[in-house]
């Protein structure tokens, strides 16, 4: 008689969004979904189905409530595309890219057809956990972090002006925090007719935590403080609330959103046996070429400002 051993894939996820102490509107939106039932939640604890669990954070911009509309559209359209287009043959990365492109198309067309919401846009960072992997798609500067073995790693790379200056050796990460270009995002959904979504995938391990957040958290709360909160509090509900509170205690000049997930179950490797952190990082197109127009305009600005 043969005994079949079934591996388990468990996840605990909780999301929190806060208006902060300065803004009049919350232009951040987020969602958590168990794809087997195609729901939209603030929290989920249970099995990760073969279809996976989806988390996404969107940070809207445009002023006068436009950002709130853009972020909601981004969440709704992206999620709908993932729910309704489950063609496994095209691959998970392609599904995420297609969904991001569709969200961009809808926001762009809405913005161009209605003067009252012209100029609206939104970032998007989404993570789809399909054991033992997580696939992350990014447009903009909302971040995804991995916490493993007492260390925190930024998985995504900000698509921002200061990140380009850091990559070019022009400024340091410390200088970027106070740089006059620190709020310039190089691409976002709805800002242009097309975007270049960036896909990253990695193998998850037991006890890993994933943190998705808007820049209201990442720009205001140091990574060492994020790590301290996450490793000292195993309850993802309490930890996510503590992250928001800590960011608000420091500056609170922006909306703040965080989704925190804990990975469990023997479907995931032991941490010491997990593969190299970044298994792949690809873009559907050349991001540097797509952003050439914007960066050439900025290059005309006084060099003293850049430095």
Predicted region positions:
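PP2C/PPM-type serine/threonine phosphatase catalytic domain
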Residues: 1-307
């Amino acid at each position: 008689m043969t005994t079949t051993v079934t591996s388990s894939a468990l996840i605990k996820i909780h999301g929190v969004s806060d208006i902060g102490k300065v803004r009049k509107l919350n232009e951040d939106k987020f969602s958590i979904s168990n794809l087997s039932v195609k729901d939209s939640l603030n929290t989920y604890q249970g099995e990760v189905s073969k279809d996976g669990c989806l988390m996404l954070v969107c940070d809207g911009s445009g002023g006068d409530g436009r950002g709130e509309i853009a972020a909601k559209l981004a969440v709704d359209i992206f999620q709908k595309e993932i729910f309704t287009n489950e063609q496994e043959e095209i691959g998970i990365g392609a599904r995420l890219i297609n969904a991001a492109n569709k969200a961009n198309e809808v926001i762009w067309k809405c913005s161009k057809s209605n003067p009252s919401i012209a100029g609206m846009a939104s970032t998007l960072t989404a993570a789809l956990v399909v054991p033992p992997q997580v696939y992350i798609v990014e447009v903009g500067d909302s971040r995804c972090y991995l916490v493993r073995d007492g260390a925190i790693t930024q998985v995504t790379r900000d698509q921002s002006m200061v990140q380009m200056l850091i990559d070019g050796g022009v400024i340091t990460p410390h200088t970027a925090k106070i740089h006059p270009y620190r709020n310039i995002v190089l691409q976002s959904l709805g800002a242009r007719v097309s975007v270049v979504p960036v896909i990253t995938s990695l193998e998850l391990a037991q006890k890993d935590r994933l943190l998705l957040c808007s820049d209201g958290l990442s720009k205001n709360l140091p990574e060492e403080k994020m790590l301290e909160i996450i490793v000292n509090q195993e309850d993802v509900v309490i930890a996510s609330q503590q992250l928001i509170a800590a960011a608000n205690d420091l500056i609170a000049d922006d909306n703040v959103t965080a989704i925190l997930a804990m990975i469990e179950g023997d479907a995931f490797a032991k941490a010491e046996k997990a593969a190299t952190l970044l298994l792949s990082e690809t873009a559907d197109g050349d991001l540097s070429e797509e952003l050439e127009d914007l960066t050439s305009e900025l290059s005309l600005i006084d060099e003293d400002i850049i430095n």
